[in-house]
């Protein structure tokens, strides 16, 4: 007999040991099968896994297990992203470093070694965490971005870009982290609200006394680098005569924004002097507001240009600093402006910044504002809270600065990338057609260089003498004296001789870490060093990651793949959501709302955790709820009890699967539902919609099998051993359990394996593991849609009858004389005809009949809570209208307002004496609640039976054990039902007299009843 309660811990420890002792994973893999190329999106080895990474790997494992059971041999190489700022920043924190100079003082070689060790240690720890979630991957042979064969794949990609003219070194404005002292990709910038200065500045117009162009900025520190002002060509601008404290100024800004702006400047009055379009302002010269503080600015001419990116916001006049803004830079290049960037890698002003040299840009804001105020050029000053970008790893606010960087010309590949997106299967569809396409459509050239240490070195060597460039595309192009290590600083020592006689040295940059993972589809199989697997497998059949990867891994893979092969590197992509707290907030230590995977597993087990995260539609964010998680565990307990029930009786009777008996209608129904569930699972998994399978499983196994079918067939398992009816029930239950387990095994592998070993293989021969079995595929010929529809109606009738019983205060154990179903539906009539026996037994009534109309009076009243807000003063008229109705109309429109009839109208039935009612979708059920003497005796017998069965449980009696029962009560109360009591309680003797043995006193319907039971040995 199976344990009475489901213990996830016991099940899991046993199965983990079984898998390990018997090398099950290897044996499953050895079965082989059709090719299925899966590429694992590599997580950063920065610490412990969190709820999101756990969900991600469970999702992948589920699909891989499914594919294996479907006859595929999927690649299951786990990946690890082990380079980049994610690792560097963690190691810097461990070492107490604050700047790059700390790293160089420590020694680049030693820092690289620490990064390597940190990444490897975390990889090992995270591997154990993933394994504890029953994730089957080839953990002994992962792909790691730190391996030479993988780094070679990135070198191959950059060489292809160079050969195609897509690799370019140029000066561009990029996101810059001044703490990490490196460029960042757009995908590496995280945004949140931050408070900054908000200032309105007057730029003096050249040659016009007391005349100014008014600009607005939240980055005063960029003003030393100002080179121009931009206006929109078709926006209306005006020169205002403004008066403050008797002094007159002339201010140029967008006409429609003047009241707001000049109001902030505390002007007493203002009036329009002149209006013009933005294009009329082009060429207007002004004096730099900080020319005295930044003397270099006196060397350049400053003027107004028009630009389409200017909007009618703030002042309509935009301060342009080509060295500190992307659009500014583009306009500067177009107009031939100086790209002035007097800020170094640390975010500190250089000597070119004049007065501000040596100050950090953010710290200089106040000094600049003070200087503007002193020169009477500060029109207004405020504080603003706005979304601002921060470094994704160290969380420092970024700055924008123009620097020399290496770029892939994505702008030249964009059309091809968009075409490739259309060839991919996206789940959900809009992940590709909307979200990803939008991102790619707006993508700029990809800055692939980083000014850091721990990464794949960019394989570009440049001659110190003539500037000749060499791009290395393979590690085979380098002669190595010692162990092959492509990392800095060893690679920096490699030089080449140039034809000019000079020495070629490697550029100091490393790759953007997204370039690392971008080559995963071929780097993970060591292409181009080894070509066999690539030719057999590439491109990937399937990948899945979170929705942030539309700008991350999905994008970097597509870009590198189109560069190298003019083709998308994946055929199908499932985009999943993020894990949030119950309020929809991101989990963070600062909010104190972090839930660790181990915490969840500790409460509901590994399978409970897996089923919980897989229950939600994967592309939706998962709002973690402890109550919902525990509900999954409750449902697993229902599954356990259902399997235990079946196993108990089949085991007692030494059942062997194959003996079919005579299937009854409820057997045919549940077998039909089984195949419908499996059909749903098959279709869902082909579309990678895992949540549909989990939901369908619980709906079928918990609701249909456990809470309905088993309740119907309970009396049949007490029949004689060779009863055809009992054999049919056994056949049906076993088939349901066997096929359901194979359908849910990829999702809940531990409990499925446990049941397979302890239940399935007891009644039929099987494989060594459930994962060597084939996944269940639907036998559609067994699906009876008409029967399923009829049973759905029957269940509704039974539920409605239970509601009517509640109203009548009649327990289900108390039999009733009659159930009347009022319905004009042929579907209902046919269902009752087909399933009369089921309805009678589950409603516990003696007879059931269907009528078109039941004798009653109907009172129809308005539901004022619903109609009040909709009809207001017309509610009284509606009440009069409703009073005239004889029945509820299908459609209801009153005074031009469409109402829901079921909500707008309340129906009250006045029934014949002794009846109670309840509604269901197909009509109304009526029960006759009055009890005659015969029904009372039967009801009392059922109450006695329930108490005896409870006492059997308390004595922990086996199901088949016989007892002797003594009852102290008036025997007349159960007269005629003695044999029924004996049969239902396995009592060989039933004596009315002094209670003996194990005795308990009960209160049954106000009567004291003493019951004694004795175990009969023999």
From Swiss-Prot:
Binding-site positions, ATP: 589
GO BP term, pick one: isoleucyl-tRNA aminoacylation
A Gene Ontology cellular-component term: cytoplasm
Motif 'KMSKS' region: chain residues: 586-590
PROSITE patterns reported in the protein's UniProt record: AA_TRNA_LIGASE_I
Main location: cytoplasm
Annotated InterPro entries: aa-tRNA-synth_I_CS, aa-tRNA-synth_Ia, Anticodon_Ile_ABEc, Ile-tRNA-ligase, Ile-tRNA-ligase_type2, M/V/L/I-tRNA-synth_anticd-bd, Rossmann-like_a/b/a_fold, tRNAsynth_Ia_anticodon-bd
EC code: 6.1.1.5
Keyword Metal-binding: yes
Catalysed reactions listed for this entry: tRNA(Ile) + L-isoleucine + ATP = L-isoleucyl-tRNA(Ile) + AMP + diphosphate
SUPFAM superfamilies: Anticodon-binding domain of a subclass of class I aminoacyl-tRNA synthetases, Nucleotidylyl transferase, ValRS/IleRS/LeuRS editing domain
GO molecular function: aminoacyl-tRNA deacylase activity; ATP binding; isoleucine-tRNA ligase activity; tRNA binding; zinc ion binding
Cofactor needs: Zn(2+)
Location in the cell: Cytoplasm
Short motif 'HIGH' region, span: 43-53
The UniProt record lists the keyword Chloroplast: no
Keywords annotated in UniProt: Aminoacyl-tRNA synthetase, ATP-binding, Cytoplasm, Ligase, Metal-binding, Nucleotide-binding, Protein biosynthesis, Zinc
Gene3D superfamilies reported in the protein's UniProt record: HUPs, Isoleucyl-tRNA Synthetase, Domain 1
Highest taxon of the lineage: Archaea
UniProt family annotation: Belongs to the class-I aminoacyl-tRNA synthetase family. IleS type 2 subfamily.
Quaternary structure, from the entry: Monomer.
Function: Catalyzes the attachment of isoleucine to tRNA(Ile). As IleRS can inadvertently accommodate and process structurally similar amino acids such as valine, to avoid such errors it has two additional distinct tRNA(Ile)-dependent editing activities. One activity is designated as 'pretransfer' editing and involves the hydrolysis of activated Val-AMP. The other activity is designated 'posttransfer' editing and involves deacylation of mischarged Val-tRNA(Ile).
Entry remark concerning the domains of this protein: IleRS has two distinct active sites: one for aminoacylation and one for editing. The misactivated valine is translocated from the active site to the editing site, which sterically excludes the correctly activated isoleucine. The single editing site contains two valyl binding pockets, one specific for each substrate (Val-AMP or Val-tRNA(Ile)).
Protein name: Isoleucine--tRNA ligase
Taxon lineage: Archaea, Methanobacteriati, Methanobacteriota, Archaeoglobi, Archaeoglobales
Gene that encodes the chain: ileS
